[in-house]
């Protein structure tokens, strides 16, 4: 939720002065089946607890059940770079704005779990296999942002937002949510729920035992976010003793997720809790489901946090504590001044993987809900460029924000306007310009450029066809010449004699020409782009050991080339620790 995108800050906080700890053994085997125990004593205890906790009254049975042959494997997908993630906001995912004012009012229907089911076939057809669902909790109503409250200002972590429930359906809130999850699972779509890092002001008043306080007795608030209050993870920070009540709350959140069939958790601002907290909570989840996946919102190494009241960022610490995947820095792709800076970042991540347990990875965070729409960085061509890159980069699981598929720029007519109808104490329709609305009951995400979604589907299909090369193969940085402004990105992915060649123009405004060294490439190599054409055309010509290119603005091309021995003639070869 909170991040820095200043490239100078990033550069000043480079990892090169960090001494990494030895790689730790993973808590659980990622290929393990759901855990069973041979301990008769433990079985007796669990059976006894089940009898003690059995409800006194008969509970309504859910009308849907998880498919009998469904097994969670989200953690393995993360660790094998096989997740293709779509981020959604349930209250807007299938909202029906009929009068065109871009928010839901009158008798219009906002998004619910049940009407979200209507879009799942679309999600599957687009190529996604995982949903990242932004927080589903009731939002705080006091000191609120927007007329529906920020999704990251939860009033109750163990409850479900009434906005997400269809009042005409007789099932309970959790049964309706489970019906949605079951429909996802029928399509082999995994469900990852967002865990907010902070509390609403409402929760702060109700549960002071969970809250962090300043030395002057005031509530600790993250800089720039007046609607939320920070949790206190410590009972005694000097002794590194955790706050047992806050830890228990989060265990109950994990239990709720697993009981409902959720496959994993995305932790908002993971650094808001110390590694000791995650050292307990993540293994706790794996005791119940060894395949329960964990994604940390963490970006880059920081010597000190640039934000008041927020701990410094330490991605490696989060990964060692048990997180499977992190955000990383692809969201500042547009800020990297040249191709070399971008390539160096990729290599840093691959090098980092060897200081960690095997299989740690990143999401393709070229755009998240915290970032402005990629449409502002170069329109549809930029969207296609970043899609082609994240479809082929190593150590990465592609990640898309709902609305990207058709070029939503997340500009809302009602931005900051007064609305007499509100669910909170705020009548202002707060919006962060250019970002997906998380404060109001807004329209269904979407733009008017469906060709972006078509390109995305083709990129996913290409990734699936060459899955082993892309998820397991080496990453080869290719040398180039005559690229005066260093705008051409050129690399190969190689495995077992099969090679994919990727060339892209980072410049979104003009064509760029150069020569790329491709060892063992033949002059008669056919160059058939595995991705759809778009934008201004490119000119490419194969020569022996070299490729001449004049790439159109923001163009990306992927070719399968016949270079089974390319690794024998390259010295910039990198591989993820998997």
Regions found by a protein language model. Give the residues of each.
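Non-Sec secretion/translocation targeting segments of pathogen effectors
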Residues: 1-65, 578
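N-terminal structural segment of carbohydrate-active enzymes
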Residues: 59-190, 198, 554-578
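Active-site-proximal helices and loops of the catalytic beta/alpha 8
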Residues: 66-67, 181, 185, 189, ...
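The substrate-binding groove and active-site-proximal loops of carbohydrate-active enzymes
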Residues: 91-113, 153-174, 229-247, 262-272, ...
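Aromatic- and acidic-residue-enriched segments that line the glycan-binding/catalytic groove
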Residues: 139-158, 197-226, 307-324, 413-427
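Active-site-adjacent "subsite" loops/lids of carbohydrate-active enzymes
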Residues: 201-260, 270-271
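Short, well-ordered beta-strand segments enriched in hydrophobic/aromatic residues
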Residues: 499-507
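C-terminal beta-sandwich/jelly-roll accessory domains of carbohydrate-active enzymes
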Residues: 507-578
């Amino acid at each position: 939720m909170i991040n820095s995108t200043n490239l100078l800050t990033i550069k000043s906080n480079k990892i090169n002065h960090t001494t990494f700890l030895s790689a730790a053994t993973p808590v659980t085997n990622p290929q393990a089946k759901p855990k069973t125990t041979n301990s008769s004593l433990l079985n007796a205890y669990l059976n006894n607890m089940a009898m003690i906790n059995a409800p006194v009254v008969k509970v309504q049975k859910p009308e849907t059940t998880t498919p009998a042959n469904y097994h969670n494997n989200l953690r393995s997908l993360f660790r094998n770079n096989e997740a293709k993630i779509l981020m959604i906001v349930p209250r807007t995912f299938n909202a029906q704005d009929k009068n065109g004012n871009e928010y839901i009012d009158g008798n219009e229907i906002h998004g619910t779990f049940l009407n979200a089911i209507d879009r799942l076939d679309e999600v599957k057809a687009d190529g996604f296999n995982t949903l990242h669902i932004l927080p589903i909790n009731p939002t705080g109503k006091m000191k609120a942002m927007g007329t529906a409250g920020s999704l990251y200002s939860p009033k109750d972590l163990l409850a479900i937002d009434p906005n997400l429930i269809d009042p005409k359906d007789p099932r309970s809130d959790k049964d309706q949510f489970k019906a949605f999850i079951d429909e996802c699972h029928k399509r082999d779509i995994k469900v990852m729920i967002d865990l907010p890092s902070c509390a609403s002001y409402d929760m702060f008043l109700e549960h002071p035992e969970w809250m962090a306080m300043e030395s002057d007795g005031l509530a600790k608030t993250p800089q720039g976010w007046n609607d939320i209050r920070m949790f206190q993870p410590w009972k005694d920070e000097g002794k590194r003793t955790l706050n047992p009540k806050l830890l228990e709350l989060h265990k109950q959140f994990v239990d709720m997720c697993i009981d409902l069939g959720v496959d994993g958790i995305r932790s908002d601002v993971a650094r808001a809790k110390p590694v000791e907290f995650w050292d307990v909570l993540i293994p706790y989840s794996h005791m119940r489901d060894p395949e329960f996946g964990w994604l940390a919102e963490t970006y880059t190494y920081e010597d000190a946090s640039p934000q008041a009241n927020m701990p410094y960022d330490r991605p490696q610490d989060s990964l060692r504590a048990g997180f499977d995947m992190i955000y990383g820095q692809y969201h500042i792709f547009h800020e990297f001044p040249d191709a070399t800076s971008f390539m160096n970042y990729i290599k840093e991540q691959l090098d980092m993987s060897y200081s960690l347990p095997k299989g740690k990875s990143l999401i393709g965070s070229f755009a998240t809900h915290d970032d402005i729409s990629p449409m502002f960085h170069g329109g549809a061509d930029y969207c296609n460029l970043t899609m082609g890159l994240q479809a082929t980069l190593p150590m990465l699981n592609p990640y898309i924000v709902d609305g990207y598929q058709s070029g939503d720029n997340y500009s809302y007519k009602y931005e900051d306007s007064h609305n007499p109808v509100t669910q909170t104490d705020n009548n202002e329709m707060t919006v962060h310009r250019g970002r997906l609305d998380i404060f109001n009951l807004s329209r269904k995400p979407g733009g008017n450029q469906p060709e972006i979604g078509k390109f995305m589907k083709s990129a996913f299909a290409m990734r699936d066809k060459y899955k082993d090369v892309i998820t397991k193969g080496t990453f080869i940085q290719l040398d180039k010449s005559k690229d005066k402004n260093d705008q051409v990105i050129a690399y190969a992915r190689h495995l077992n004699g099969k090679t994919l060649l990727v060339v892209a123009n980072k410049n979104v405004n003009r064509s760029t020409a150069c020569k790329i060294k491709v060892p063992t490439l033949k002059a008669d190599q056919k160059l058939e782009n595995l991705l759809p054409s778009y934008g201004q055309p490119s000119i490419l010509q194969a020569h022996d050991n070299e490729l001449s290119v004049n790439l159109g603005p923001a163009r990306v091309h992927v070719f399968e080339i016949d270079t089974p021995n390319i690794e024998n003639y390259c010295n910039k070869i990198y591989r993820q620790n998997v």
